[in-house]
């Protein structure tokens, strides 16, 4: 029985991929070929028997992990290839991943996750679900699967392989059929891996980068920003080892800073283009508003780029918005292999990193520049309790995005003689690379049909075709591209395989018997999965019928019914639905009882995949002016709803907002309020008094300068008396002296009419060192006389100016 899932999670402990190759399907070999597979009492038996001597696969067969690493990074994806050197081949195989020094008889002995690449070639074993085996028994020279490395703490993993080549030739585990990988030191996670070898590949390769944003309220519920969540436009490039866009442990450039804080790729693109000698392709893809939507509603953004021998690295980044300065991306991803070829596929799960330019800790923290600037580093779950990724136990952060980089073409003479797979041969045959898919959003198509047989009947270049249907054209003014697609191919006869065979699906279950009693008929169907490569007609049957018996003899209570009618149309026009069929009672039971025969049947039916016509929107308007005339602000743009969706409301955003930055705002001088006027500096005649104010904020960025801080105005008290004679002055002074001496004897404080005062305090310190300040001193009442007719005794205060010289 064939399993449907394309991936299987193994035990949580991180281990490397141990590959073992058992022959699982009974169709693969007869009893004469293999001994019976005995059932193990352990978790997964990997027993494979063949007649003859077991041999070591040192030369003919090899098990290889792409890039030939000695270490694995937990959670990363690795392509694993099992191949035979020509003219050798194999028919049966099994792959399995075991922790080091484990036998595989318990579930916890296994580690990592397998992912099926081609279901026509590989599948999970029905009696050993952690192992991968062949889908159909046939001659082959290579198979490939992905292995997702286990979590941190698993240790080393052994990849093991077992194969059966012919009836009596059997290989397992030894030599080049094993591969040991150990867990990468976690202390190296914070440093970007740098290429250490020069690239030796020839020609150029073209890749497609596809970005899948998985950041949503479901995956990251804490403080998720519902209104403004988005990914900024992707910006990056393919470049040489002499240029670094960004890296862990390095400092963000101004371009990286503007992507991280504002989501603007303009400065970053300018920086990349300035390195024209080191850059081959600038990578750009549109922003995503909101951050996550199902792929059947919005296609994942993608971009194509090329690499060559000197510019074989690629880097990119995109801002996670809103956020202080958080991004995801790849840095210096090497697409060149040690075998002088080009990597076929890279799959990486991404966690956010901090650009080191803003110190905010939540999605919508206010701007708080980091001074001095810090180094780029990955975010962790222990950064801050208010962080949306905080975990007091220090667990790993759930990935927020996944990037897939796939090779789609190669041009020029290639160095590696053996291609990665048949698709690579076809890609090399292509006279020119295809442009990026520019299908308008207003054109709704069905899925592509399978490829036809190759037009060449010999081992020569030919063409094959596939088709799709135009289901809807939402805007008649926008033409829809062709509904046919052609691709180069190689005709049959290029391998040892029989090109005249066709691949069939499994038989579906038998239909119900056509009668409710006695002898009837039933049928089952299958379909052609792959037509013969030589272009011949597939002669294998697609329908079978056989006799069936129900209750053998019809009793007197049995009734006679008609044949089943045709099935009704499916209740759904797309996706899953129900269909019914009916039959009639031709003759009721002879004993007069009710006919118990079934007269209607219902079963599920599957129509083509649903392609809901989306709501039609106008293009985005131009961005509005910044909300401020200086400093940091916001700007917006809008679009209009032209028509509703086919099924329900339109959930697309009609307005977008982003940060904008203008020159710093001028800061005017700020002053305190004026002080009280001081007392007149003359006790009689004309004088002046002053008041002061202090500077609280100096002017900046061209702001209004500070005005005066000291003001003077004239004052006039009583007229001064004419100068008395010298004799009168002496007499008055003597009288005043005697009076003062008398008062000092009566009281230790100064006396005013009706009260006795304490002496003046010392002058306070000046409020400013320059620019005009003030000083104060006080005199307080010590005693009021009851017999006094004066009731105006009050504390007194004097103010005078000080340090009035300019600063």
UniProtKB/Swiss-Prot annotation:
Q: Where in the cell is it found?
A: Secreted, Extracellular space, Extracellular matrix
Molecular function terms, GO-annotated: LBD domain binding; metal ion binding
Signal peptide interval: 1-28
According to the record, which residues are glycosylated?
214, 681
> Single Gene Ontology BP term?
cell adhesion
Q: List the disulfide bonds.
A: 44-128, 156-182, 199-336, 200-340, 202-415, 443-480, 454-489, 459-494, 502-538, 513-517, 548-554, 559-595, 570-574, 605-610, 615-650, 626-630, 660-665
* Domain of life according to the entry: Eukaryota
Q: What Gene3D superfamilies has UniProt attached to this entry?
A: F-spondin domain (2.60.40.2130), Reeler domain (2.60.40.4060), Thrombospondin type-1 (TSP1) repeat (2.20.100.10)
**Residues of the Reelin domain:** 29-194
Q: Which InterPro entries match?
A: Reeler_dom, Reeler_sf, Spondin/Thrombospondin_T1, Spondin_N, Spondin_N_sf, TSP1_rpt, TSP1_rpt_sf, TSP1_spondin_dom
One family name in Pfam for this protein = Reeler
Domain Spondin as annotated: residue spans: 195-388
Which keywords annotate this record? Answer: Cell adhesion, Disulfide bond, Extracellular matrix, Glycoprotein, Metal-binding, Repeat, Secreted, Signal
Q: Which residues form the TSP type-1 domain?
A: 442-495, 501-555, 558-611, 614-666, 668-721, 754-806
Described function: Cell adhesion protein that promotes the attachment of spinal cord and sensory neuron cells and the outgrowth of neurites in vitro. May contribute to the growth and guidance of axons in both the spinal cord and the PNS.
- Assembly with partners or alone: Binds to the central extracellular domain of APP and inhibits beta-secretase cleavage of APP.
Which protein are we looking at?
Spondin-1
């Amino acid at each position: 029985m064939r399993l449907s899932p394309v991936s299987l999670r193994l035990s949580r402990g991180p281990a490397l991929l141990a590959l073992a190759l058992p022959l699982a399907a009974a169709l693969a070999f007869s009893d004469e070929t293999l001994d019976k597979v005995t059932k193990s009492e352990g978790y997964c038996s990997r027993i494979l028997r063949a007649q003859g001597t077991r041999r070591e696969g040192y030369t003919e067969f090899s098990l290889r992990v792409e890039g030939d690493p000695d270490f694995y990074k937990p959670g990363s994806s690795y392509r694993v290839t099992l191949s035979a050197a020509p003219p050798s081949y194999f028919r049966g195989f099994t792959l399995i991943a075991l922790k080091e020094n484990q036998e595989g008889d318990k579930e916890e002995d296994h580690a990592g996750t397998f992912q099926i690449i081609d279901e026509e070639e590989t599948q999970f074993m029905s009696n050993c679900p952690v192992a991968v085996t062949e889908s159909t028994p046939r001659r082959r020279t290579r198979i490939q699967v992905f292995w997702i490395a286990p979590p941190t703490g698993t240790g080393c993993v052994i990849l093991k392989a077992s194969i059966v080549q012919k009836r009596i030739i059997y290989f397992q585990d030894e030599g080049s059929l094993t591969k040991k990988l150990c867990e990468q030191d976690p202390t190296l996670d914070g440093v970007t891996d740098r290429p250490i070898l020069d690239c030796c590949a020839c020609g150029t390769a073209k890749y497609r980068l596809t970005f899948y944003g998985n950041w949503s309220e479901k995956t990251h519920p804490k403080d998720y920003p519902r209104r403004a969540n988005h990914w900024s436009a992707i910006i990056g490039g393919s470049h040489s080892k002499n240029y670094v866009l960004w890296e862990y442990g390095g400092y963000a450039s101004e371009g990286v800073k503007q992507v991280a804080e504002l989501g603007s790729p303009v400065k970053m693109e300018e920086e990349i283009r300035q390195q024209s000698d080191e850059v081959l392709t600038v990578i750009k893809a549109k922003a995503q508003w909101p951050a996550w939507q199902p792929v059947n509603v919005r296609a994942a953004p993608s971009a194509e780029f090329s690499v060559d021998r000197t510019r074989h690295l690629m880097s990119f980044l995109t801002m996670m918005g809103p956020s202080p300065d958080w991004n995801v991306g790849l840095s210096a991803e090497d697409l060149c292999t040690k075998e002088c070829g080009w990597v076929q596929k890279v799959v990486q799960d991404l966690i956010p990193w901090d650009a080191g330019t803003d110190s905010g800790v939540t999605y919508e923290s206010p701007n708080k520049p980091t001074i001095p600037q810090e180094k780029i580093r990955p975010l962790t779950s222990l950064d801050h309790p208010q962080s949306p990724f905080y975990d007091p136990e220090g667990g790993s952060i759930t990935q927020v995005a996944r990037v897939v980089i796939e090779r789609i073409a190669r041009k020029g003479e290639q160095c590696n003689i053996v291609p990665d797979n048949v698709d690579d041969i076809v890609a090399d045959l292509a006279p020119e690379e295809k442009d990026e898919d520019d299908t308008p959003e207003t054109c709704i198509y069905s899925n592509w049909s399978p490829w036809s047989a190759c037009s060449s009947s010999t081992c020569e270049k030919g063409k094959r075709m596939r088709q799709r249907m135009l289901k809807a054209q939402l805007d008649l003014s926008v033409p829809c591209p062709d509904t046919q697609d052609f691709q180069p191919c190689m005709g049959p006869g290029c391998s040892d395989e029989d090109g005249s065979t066709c691949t069939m699906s499994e038989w579906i279950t038998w239909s119900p018997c056509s009668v409710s009693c006695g002898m009837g008929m039933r049928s089952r169907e299958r379909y052609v999965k792959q037509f013969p490569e030589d272009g011949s007609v597939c002669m294998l049957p697609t329908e079978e019928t056989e006799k069936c018996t129900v209750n053998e003899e019809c009793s007197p209570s049995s009734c006679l019914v008609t044949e089943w009618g045709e099935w009704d149309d499916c209740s759904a026009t797309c996706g899953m639905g129900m269909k019914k069929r009916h039959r009639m009672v031709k003759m009721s039971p002879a004993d007069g009882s009710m006919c118990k025969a079934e007269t209607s049947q219902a079963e599920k039916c599957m129509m083509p995949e649903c392609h809901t016509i989306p709501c039609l929107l106008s293009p985005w308007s131009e961005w509005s002016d910044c909300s401020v005339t200086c400093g940091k602000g916001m700007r917006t743009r809008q679009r209009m709803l032209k028509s509703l969706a086919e099924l329900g409301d339109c959930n697309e955003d009609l307005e977008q907002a982003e940060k904008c930055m203008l020159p710093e705002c001028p800061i005017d001088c700020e002053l305190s309020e004026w002080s009280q006027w001081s007392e007149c500096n003359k006790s009689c005649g004309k004088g002046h008094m002053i008041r002061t104010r202090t500077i609280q904020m100096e002017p900046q960025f061209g702001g209004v300068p500070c005005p005066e801080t000291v003001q003077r105005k004239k004052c006039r008290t009583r007229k001064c008396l004419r100068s008395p004679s010298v004799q009168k002055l002496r007499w008055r002074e003597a009288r005043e002296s005697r009076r003062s001496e008398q008062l000092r004897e009566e009281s230790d404080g100064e006396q005013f009419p009706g009260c006795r005062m304490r002496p003046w305090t010392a002058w306070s310190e000046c409020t400013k060192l320059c620019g005009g300040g003030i000083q104060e001193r006080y005199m307080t009442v010590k005693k009021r006389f009851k017999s006094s007719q004066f009731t105006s005794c009050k504390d007194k205060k004097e103010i005078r100016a000080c340090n009035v010289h300019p600063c």
